[in-house]
Structures are given as structure tokens and as C-alpha cells.
């Protein structure tokens, strides 16, 4: 199984980078930017292919999606060649440093994501994953991969939905890639999801982070190199996103979003030709489309980070004008700021945005607590990271002293405000206005704050390194040496200073520290421990390995075309997405709502009476169900594991016993049963 995971990881890298590299090759002469943008183009091409194939009625699979995506990427490449003729020589100056980024990220990803897995196919059993895995499964079954038709019940005709299904847009970039990978390799869906998540953490994120640091610091090699050790040490991003809820699509879109920043900065850079600006502009537009497919709130995340940059660029562009009057840069900055506010308000009031911006998450901490988390980099609800807090503070002070970097400090302050509001404020118009684009979810906003803090942490690390080098110079160690010795000593100081910074950053990854009788857990130790607990597939899990094994045996006994009535809160809601079982109830919520089908209500509440009630028989017939699956008899376990469970809603199923009229035992193992419906 672990070899299968390795195979899936390698396959995923090919899926994300071969088409994307073809498409991005002609748009930038810098290899690091090309590689950073490759997965953005690939994800866009797969989603676009799924949409087109859905419109023309072609069954989507790896065999039909991949050729279409390759053709689309080739078209993108040819357009880039036409725009950027003649092609500039390739700039590979940062490739070696990018490799360092990836190597470090691989080590961290293995520790934080792979080792906590309870087997390569284990998964976190939460609400988000019911939908995420279920949507990918529906793609594979239905062959309809359109993001406008995503649903747990959007399947071939003949299978009824127990809930009113309204085909609407849902960002399904993550689901599409998982479906492509599963279709290509034939491996389990959960294993393919783990492979893709690992690639996001270990490949997409570090490459995009390297390109991000390079573009905002004008490709300063010292800062880019230090970024390799600084960018992975903030636990809130991307690592926490893989553990909380978990937010796989946001982890993908935020990680790739760092590459989109490069296109935006390149479009507004002082240097570069008109063709370069056009190329970066088109890449930026493709990136925004990719965000639309992956997770649209990434657009607002990047916007929150780059608002100060835009205002600063407006000032600088006008100030550099030869005919500029003294007040015009200020006017330009004000107009830019007003335009951004108006765009924010316009988006906030769009009708289709209301379900998002009006959604509310309860506060996770107090106002003083959220401020403390920001100052000590312990957000969201993580153990503090003193090293990173010190680097961010030093970088913040330095950025405020330089007109070229002051926007970074302002960006961090704004994102810190967003986090404090989302984490501590009760429902209010201000909270919805400022953080509604992220569902007012403090975990998502914490990732935005972490991204805004990356440049400051790099500046802080640079200052620390220069301070250490300066200590050596101040001691005049080489005043009486020849030239060669001076060079050796200089390089030694540079190496020692870099080593000190590396060791400082490495402290962030220490799982725990023992101080006498006190054990202090580090942020990454906390994530690894929590992830290990959430990934368990033991009998204490909602859907355990033994239950999954029973479901597979049950599927062998159920004729093709028949569905299985289940009680989802015994863990069987995951039987559909993980094991491809045709269960009727496959969502975590919606039962008892206005959107539930009356037949569904009747089945939930009165299935045990099927032997004498014709209305129950008719309801069962409407779902094409011939069997009943029960995995757990103890309602207390369902209460403890799923807060949405209300035992009184499921008495029609949970009351069925081996001697209930109208049912026949087909399989049994402990409390687990598969019944055949006899009437």
C-alpha cells in the first residue's frame, strides 16, 4: 500500500506539471516562475476539460480529460510564443535554491502529513471530507465533471436523491485532480487524495513560495535562500489547513496563489518590456480563473495581502512620472484605495455571494487571546512560535524603515486585523464585511495572515544573519591576514550566520520541550499529534477499517443497480465516497430540512414497518433499494462522533433487528448487519 502511495505521488506530479509546464513554458523566461505556474495551468485545464465534456455529453475520465488538457495547454503555449517573440534566454539562476525549498518541504510534509496517517488510505472523518471525497466519487461514477453539476447525488438516472439537489457551481479543482488521479491509476480515492495533498505540501507550496519570495525581493539570492528555511515554519499555513476541517481546496488554492502573486507583481514591475507585462497580465488572469475553480476566496486572500502593494505602486508610478506634481502621487494612492474599497463593497453585495459572506463561524477566542496569538504567532489556537514571532517582529521594524518595503508591514497589519475580527468578534456587520469572504472562519483567515507574514519573516532572518556577520567583522578577525585568508574567514562568517538562522528555524519543528515536570508542545508537534488522532481507522473511528471491510463484503452480495438504505451516522456516510457503496444516505446534514424528500423522511422514521405499510414500500421502491446496512447499534457513539446526529430521526432503521418482519439477514459480523428487504 505504501508503494502504491509513492506511485500515486509520482503520477500526481506528472499530472500537475507535464501539461502545466507545456502551457507555462512560453510565458516567462524564469524557470522558477514557469514551474510555479505549471500546476495552476494544469488544474485550470482539467477543470475546463471537465466543463466542456459535460456540455457536449462525453463521459469524463482520465482517458478523455488528459488529452483535452494537453491540447489546451499546447494552445496556451502557442499563444505565449506569439506574444513574447523573440523568446528570451532561460533564467535558471534560482533553480538550485528552489530544490532546497522542495527538499525541506518534503521532510516537513512527511513528518506532519504522512507519518500521522493510519495507513496510506486513511482519512479525516469530518463534514468537509464527506463532501470532498463524495464529490470526487460522483465525478468518477457519473462521468460529469462539471463544477456546475457537483453533487453527492448527481449520478446516472435510476438512482434517486433523498435531498433536493440543485445543480449549482462549487469550486471543484481539488476534487477534479483527485478524480483524474484515481481514474488514471485505479487506486483508492482516499489514497489518491493523500497523494495529492502531499504534492500540494511538498511540491506546489515550496516552489510557489520560492517564486513568491524571489519576485517581491527582486530576486535577491540571499533573501530567496533564507526563505527556504523561513517559509515552512509557520504552522498555520499550509500545514494547519490539512488538519483543520480539513480545508484541502484552500490549501491547494492558497499554495498555488503564491505563484499568482508573481504574475501580478511582474505585471506592475518597474523593469520589463510591454510584451512581458502583457504576458504576466494574461498569466494573472489565468490564475484568477484557476482560483475560481479551486477556491474563489483565494482572490480576496491575495487581495488582502496586495492592497497596500497596489496603493504603493500607484504612488510610485505617478511619482516617477517626469511631469508629476508633488500632490499627484498622494491623489493616485487615494484613488487606488477608494477603487479597492468600492470593489470590495461591490463583491460583498453581489446576490450570489450572500450565502458565503453572511455565513458565520462562532468566535474561537477572546480579543486579548487573538491579539496574543498574533504577537506570538500562535494562531489559530496553536502553541506559540517564539522564533517566528521574533523574525516577523524584526522584519516588521525593518520594513517600516524602507519606503520600498513598508507595504509589507501594512499588509501584515491589515491581515492581523482580519484575523482578530474573525477569531474574537461576535456576529456583526463589520465582521461579515471584513471576513465574510472566508465564511468568517478564523482558520482560513489565519492562513492569509501567515502568507502576509512570510516576507517579514524573510526580512527578519536577513537582519539576523547580517547581524551575526557584523559581529565577526566588528572583531576585526581578518585585519592582519592576507587576501586569501580574509576570503576564507568571510565565507566562514557567512556560513556560520546561515547555519545559525537554519538552527533557529529548526527549533520550530521540535515536537515538544521538557522543562522539569512541564512538557511544552510545539506547533508542529501539535499538528502531527492531532492529525494522527483524526486519521485513526481503529474501531473507535466513525468509519473503521473493520466496517469498511464489512461494507466491501456487503457490496459483493448486493446485485448491481440496487441501492442500500443506511443510517449515515454509524459511519456509512463514508461508504459511498471511500468504498463506492451505493448507499442512500450519504451526507452529514440536511435531514429534517425543507429540502428533504418526503420518501426519505418516511424511510428514516418507519422503514421497520415495511411489512404492513404500503407507503413505506412505495418510498423504498423510489430509491431502488433492496438492502439495509447497519454498522453500529450504539447511538451514544454516533452522538459523540457526529454533533448532527439526532437518534429520534432514525428509529425506522435502527429499530430493525434480525427478527423484524420483512427483512432477512444476509451478512452479519458482531453488531454489523446487511439485511435483504423481502417485500
Regions found by a protein language model. Give the residues of each.
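Membrane-embedded, hydrophobic transmembrane alpha-helices
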Residues: 1-95
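Extracytoplasmic
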Residues: 11, 17, 24, 476, ...
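Membrane-embedded helix bundles of polyisoprenyl
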Residues: 38-51, 101-111, 167, 183, ...
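Membrane-helix boundary/interfacial segments in multi-pass membrane proteins
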Residues: 56-63, 119-127, 186, 239-252, ...
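Active-site lumenal/periplasmic loops and adjacent helix-entry segments of GT-C-fold
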Residues: 108-255, 531-541
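Perimembrane helix-loop-helix junctions
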Residues: 302-335
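Hydrophobic, aromatic-rich transmembrane alpha-helices
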Residues: 310-311, 316, 385-409
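Signature aromatic-anchored transmembrane alpha helix within multi-pass, membrane-resident enzymes
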Residues: 333-341, 464-521
Amino acid at each position: 500500500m505504501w508503494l502504491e502511495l509513492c506511485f500515486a505521488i509520482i503520477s500526481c506530479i506528472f499530472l500537475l506539471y507535464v501539461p502545466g509546464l507545456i502551457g507555462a513554458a512560453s510565458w516567462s523566461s524564469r524557470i522558477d516562475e514557469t514551474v510555479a505556474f505549471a500546476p495552476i495551468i494544469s488544474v485550470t485545464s482539467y477543470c475546463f476539460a471537465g466543463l466542456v465534456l459535460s456540455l457536449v455529453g462525453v463521459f469524463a475520465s482520465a482517458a478523455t480529460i488528459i488529452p483535452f488538457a494537453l491540447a489546451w495547454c499546447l494552445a496556451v503555449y502557442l499563444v505565449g510564443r506569439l506574444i513574447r517573440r523573440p523568446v528570451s534566454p532561460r533564467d535558471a539562476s534560482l533553480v538550485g535554491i528552489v530544490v532546497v525549498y522542495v527538499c525541506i518541504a518534503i521532510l516537513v510534509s512527511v513528518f506532519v502529513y504522512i507519518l500521522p496517517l493510519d495507513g496510506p488510505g486513511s482519512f479525516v472523518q469530518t463534514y468537509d471530507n464527506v463532501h470532498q471525497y463524495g464529490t470526487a466519487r460522483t465525478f468518477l461514477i457519473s462521468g460529469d465533471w462539471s463544477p456546475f453539476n457537483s453533487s453527492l447525488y448527481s449520478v446516472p438516472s435510476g438512482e434517486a436523491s433523498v435531498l433536493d439537489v440543485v445543480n449549482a457551481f462549487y469550486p471543484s479543482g481539488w476534487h477534479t485532480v483527485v478524480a483524474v488521479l484515481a481514474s488514471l491509476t485505479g487506486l483508492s480515492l482516499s489514497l489518491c487524495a493523500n497523494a495529492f495533498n502531499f504534492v500540494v505540501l511538498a511540491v506546489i507550496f515550496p516552489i510557489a513560495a520560492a517564486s513568491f519570495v524571489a519576485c517581491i525581493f527582486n530576486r535577491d539570492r540571499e533573501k530567496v535562500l533564507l526563505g527556504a528555511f523561513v517559509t515552512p515554519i509557520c504552522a498555520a499555513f499550509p500545514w494547519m489547513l490539512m488538519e483543520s476541517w480539513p480545508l484541502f481546496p484552500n490549501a491547494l488554492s492558497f499554495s498555488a496563489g503564491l505563484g499568482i502573486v508573481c504574475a501580478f507583481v511582474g505585471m506592475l514591475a518597474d523593469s520589463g518590456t510591454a510584451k512581458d507585462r502583457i504576458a504576466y497580465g494574461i498569466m494573472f488572469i489565468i490564475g484568477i480563473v484557476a482560483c475560481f475553480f479551486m477556491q474563489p476566496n483565494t482572490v480576496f486572500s491575495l487581495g488582502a495581502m496586495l492592497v497596500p502593494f497596489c496603493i504603493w505602486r500607484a504612488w510610485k508610478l505617478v511619482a516617477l512620472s517626469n511631469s508629476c506634481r508633488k500632490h499627484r502621487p498622494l491623489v493616485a494612492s487615494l484613488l487606488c484605495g477608494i477603487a479597492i474599497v468600492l470593489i470590495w463593497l461591490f463583491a460583498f453585495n453581489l446576490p450570489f455571494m450572500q450565502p458565503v459572506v453572511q455565513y458565520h463561524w462562532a468566535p474561537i477566542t477572546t480579543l486579548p487571546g487573538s491579539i496574543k496569538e498574533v504577537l506570538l504567532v500562535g494562531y489559530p489556537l496553536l502553541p506559540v512560535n517564539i522564533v517566528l514571532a521574533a523574525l516577523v517582529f524584526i522584519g516588521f521594524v525593518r520594513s517600516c524603515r524602507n519606503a520600498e518595503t513598508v507595504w509589507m508591514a501594512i499588509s501584515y497589519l491589515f491581515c492581523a486585523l482580519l484575523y482578530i475580527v474573525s477569531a474574537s468578534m461576535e456576529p456583526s456587520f463589520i465582521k461579515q464585511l471584513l471576513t465574510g469572504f472566508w465564511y468568517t472562519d478564523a482558520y482560513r483567515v489565519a492562513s492569509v495572515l501567515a502568507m502576509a507574514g512570510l516576507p517579514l519573516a524573510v526580512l527578519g532572518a536577513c537582519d539576523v544573519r547580517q547581524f551575526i556577520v557584523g559581529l565577526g567583522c566588528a572583531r576585526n578577525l581578518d585585519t592582519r591576514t592576507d587576501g586569501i585568508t580574509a576570503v576564507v574567514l568571510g565565507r566562514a562568517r557567512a556560513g556560520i550566520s546561515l547555519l545559525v538562522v537554519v538552527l533557529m528555524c529548526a527549533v520550530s519543528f521540535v515536537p515538544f520541550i521538557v522543562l522539569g515536570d512541564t512538557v511544552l508542545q510545539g506547533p508542529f508537534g501539535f499538528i502531527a499529534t492531532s492529525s494522527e488522532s483524526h486519521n485513526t481507522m481503529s474501531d473507535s473511528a466513525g468509519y473503521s477499517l473493520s466496517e469498511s471491510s464489512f461494507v466491501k463484503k456487503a457490496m459483493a452480495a448486493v446485485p448491481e443497480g440496487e441501492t442500500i438504505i443506511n443510517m449515515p451516522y454509524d459511519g456509512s456516510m463514508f461508504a459511498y465516497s471511500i468504498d463506492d457503496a451505493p448507499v442512500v444516505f450519504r451526507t452529514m446534514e440536511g435531514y429534517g430540512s425543507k429540502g428533504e424528500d418526503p420518501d426519505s423522511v418516511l424511510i428514516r422514521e418507519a422503514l421497520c414497518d415495511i411489512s404492513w405499510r404500503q407507503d413505506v414500500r412505495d418510498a423504498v421502491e423510489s430509491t431502488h433499494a433492496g438492502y439495509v446496512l447497519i454498522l453500529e447499534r450504539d447511538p451514544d457513539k454516533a452522538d459523540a462522533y457526529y454533533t448532527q446526529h439526532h437518534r429520534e430521526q432514525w428509529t425506522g432503521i435502527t429499530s430493525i433487528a434480525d427478527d423484524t418482519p420483512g427483512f432477512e439477514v444476509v451478512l452479519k459480523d458482531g453488531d454489523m448487519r446487511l439485511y435483504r428487504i423481502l417485500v
